[in-house]
Amino acid sequence: MYRAITMRVEPRSDQRRFLDESIRVHHYVYNAMITAVKLYFSYYGKLPSHNGLNRVCTQIWQNNPWMHRIYQNTMNQAAKRALDAFRSCNPGIKQVSRKKKDGNVAGALVLRSPRYKKLERSNTFGYISNKSFKVVDSVDNKGKNRRSLSLGKMKGSLRCYNQSTPIREEPKTVIISRKDLGTHCEYFATIQYE
């Protein structure tokens, strides 16, 4: 059974730029994945596999050098979210192809599409592999517990505010979210563990 703990994190200014850039790139990749699924479905008449969309994410990352500052494997979460959005909009469509008797795919199925996200509504990104992040628990000079979160390709570690709640097992994923409060933004990390 998966459990989750959410805690507020306090990034420095360079870390804040990294988190904002990661959210912006994930917004771009999510919208690109919606277009990729539409094109794949119009050509093959079925939804693509998750691994197929991950390969498209890799191609996007390789073709855009401005994305190389973020961790590439986190883009796979955007592909998974786009595929899940298509599956929730089209619950009757399986991943198998449905062609007409003459072999033509056109007109066999109608695909309902999720909406493209605006940048203002994109507020999360995630590390879906525990090899790309690390939760560090330590004790300071005064004997207090200190928890910090290190993310792949980000310099330094994020200070976590929820120090006392124990994480009993090995963390599996972490989702970073941003909440706009008008005058400033607050950042939260949700750590999922088994």
Place the predicted regions along the sequence by residue.
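Nucleic-acid substrate recognition interfaces
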Residues: 1-194
